């Protein structure tokens, strides 16, 4: 059997944690091989070893049967290995073509031969079905197009083995379909692909084999045709995982949040929320369903004080809170799990223990007379780290070093521990594995069952249908329908999200 990549007994450790513990990975020529594991299982670390970003303490790497020492990404490129990182590495002010050729520019008379560069980029683009605009600035193209540019960068450098690190985490459903077709085209052309992921549906749809990693150890390698999502999920987390969220019927109480006719503008001054009204009661989860870009983000920002409203009112337990400061709104009884945990949820270069106290550090017993009591802060942080199973070497580890799932658990613990009357959860499971998703869902339902009001924003229809007691459909900044998840389907919901009336959606669904 011809293996293009063999990683044998790879060990890589960081202070306080063994990320890869004698892992083996063998990739066949012309296959799409999934590397599956929870957030923090060691998948990206293993691939960073293969790409020369990390050096292992032990183990052997073979490329096309030959033992190699990969001490830098340049060495990996020379061996035909390319990596499409989860966080793209493009220069915003450069054109797509300039980004692709950066570092390997074709020269003519000592100067960059732009005509030849553009033609070479176009030729590769046409060959692999990666349609792009070479002269467009990287900052001006969609996330999906930026990813195509990253793929073309690896192909331009002659990669035969491509590593994709969580490639669908930031893509729309349509862009995900396009990416899967691109991967199929690459394999047809003789390329081999390693796909780092925790999305089981994608593995079943596109991969040939899968290697499961759990807590830094290689668990099993399987043919995808011989397994199923349930088996993969249990191998990944070490126990059975429920894909269906269990919850009893809601018992709504008094109105907690009342939004009445608000209008909100985005950063360009364009109205993105228009005369919108919505209510959330104690003891219920209200889900907001809509295609991204229809005013959801601005709505959440207005409720949490991150954006001004131009008209209308927002009341919490009968008191108006619109246009108050974020701290005053928080102290009035709102917890916020933000859509972008890095931008609005954490200070990445602070210890995770201090991040957990970001909403409370100025209160007793953590602060007195302007002096922080670090001992009390870290004592509280340790208890929440244990309660919410935040996997970290210790409470002093910087938030940046934690996996996405553990970062999210820390945020959820911080917000729920404050005992808010209204919990706003915006994209709470984005980028998380099935085990972490199950954990988040249980916590949201626990809040509902404790009599709290929960406002859920998600672009995952399955999540909205599973968790919500009521679904409010947003389109072009307005709530155009309110539906009972027990009485609708994903198809009908999708039509409503595209702007159909309830009557039209019902007919199409019928």
Curated annotation (Swiss-Prot):
ATP binds at residues 37-44. Keywords: ATP-binding, Cell membrane, Membrane, Nucleotide-binding, Repeat, Translocase, Transport. Residues 5-240, 257-501 form the ABC transporter domain. One of its GO terms (molecular function) is ATP binding. GO terms for cellular component: plasma membrane. It holds the Pfam family ABC_tran. Belongs to the ABC transporter superfamily. Its EC number is 7.6.2.-. The keyword Phosphoprotein does not apply. Gene3D superfamilies: P-loop containing nucleotide triphosphate hydrolases. This is Guanosine import ATP-binding protein NupO. Part of an ABC transporter complex involved in the uptake of guanosine. Responsible for energy coupling to the transport system. May be a nucleoside transporter of broad specificity but with various affinities for different substrates. It is a peripheral membrane protein.
């Amino acid at each position: 059997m011809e293996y293009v990549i063999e990683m044998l007994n790879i060990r890589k450790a960081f202070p306080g944690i063994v990320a890869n513990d004698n892992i083996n990975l063998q990739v066949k020529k012309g296959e799409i091989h999934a590397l599956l594991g929870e957030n923090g299982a060691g998948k990206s670390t293993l691939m960073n070893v293969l790409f020369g970003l990390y050096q292992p303490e032990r183990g052997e790497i073979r490329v096309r049967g030959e033992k190699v020492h990969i001490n830098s990404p340049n060495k990996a490129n020379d061996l035909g290995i390319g990596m499409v990182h989860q966080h793209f590495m493009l220069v915003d002010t450069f054109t797509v073509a300039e980004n692709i050729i950066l570092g390997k520019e074709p020269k003519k008379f000592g100067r960059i031969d732009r005509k030849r560069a553009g033609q070479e980029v176009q030729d590769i683009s046409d060959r692999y079905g990666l349609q792009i605009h070479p002269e467009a600035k990287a900052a001006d193209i969609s996330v999906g197009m930026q990813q195509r540019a990253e793929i073309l960068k690896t192909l331009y450098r002659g990669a035969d083995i491509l590593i994709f690190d969580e490639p669908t985490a930031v893509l729309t459903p349509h862009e995900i379909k396009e990416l899967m077709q691109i991967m199929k085209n690459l394999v047809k052309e003789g390329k081999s692909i390693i796909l780092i992921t925790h999305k089981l549906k994608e593995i079943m749809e596109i991969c040939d084999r899968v290697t499961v990693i759990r807590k830094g150890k290689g668990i099993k390698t399987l043919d995808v045709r011989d397994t199923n999502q349930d088996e993969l999920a249990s191998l990944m987390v070490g126990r059975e995982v429920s894909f269906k969220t269990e919850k009893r019927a809601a018992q709504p109480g008094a109105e907690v949040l009342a939004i009445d006719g608000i209008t909100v503008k985005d950063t360009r001054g364009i109205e993105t929320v228009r005369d919108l009204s919505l209510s959330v009661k104690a003891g219920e989860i209200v889900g907001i369903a809509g295609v991204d870009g229809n005013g959801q983000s601005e709505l959440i920002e207005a409720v949490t004080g991150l954006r001004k409203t131009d008209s209308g009112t927002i009341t919490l337990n009968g008191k108006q809170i619109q246009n108050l400061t974020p701290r005053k709104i928080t102290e009035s009884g709102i917890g916020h799990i933000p859509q972008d945990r890095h931008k609005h949820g954490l200070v990445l270069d602070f210890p995770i223990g201090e991040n957990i106290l970001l909403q409370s550090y100025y209160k007793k017993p953590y602060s007195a007379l302007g002096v922080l009591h670090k001992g009390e802060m870290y004592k509280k942080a340790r208890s929440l780290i244990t309660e919410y199973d935040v996997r970290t070497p210790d409470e002093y580890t910087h938030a940046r070093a934690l996996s996405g799932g553990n970062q999210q658990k820390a945020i959820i613990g911080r917000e729920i521990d404050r005992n808010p009357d209204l919990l706003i959860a915006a994209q709470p499971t984005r980028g998380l594995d099935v085990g972490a998703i199950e954990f988040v869902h249980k916590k949201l339902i626990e809040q509902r069952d404790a009599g709290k009001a929960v406002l859920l924003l998600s672009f995952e229809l399955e999540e909205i249908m599973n968790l919500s007691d009521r679904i409010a459909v947003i389109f072009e900044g307005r709530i155009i329908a309110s539906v009972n998840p027990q009485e609708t389907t994903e198809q009908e919901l999708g039509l409503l999200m595209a702007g159909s009336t309830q009557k039209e959606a019902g007919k199409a669904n019928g």
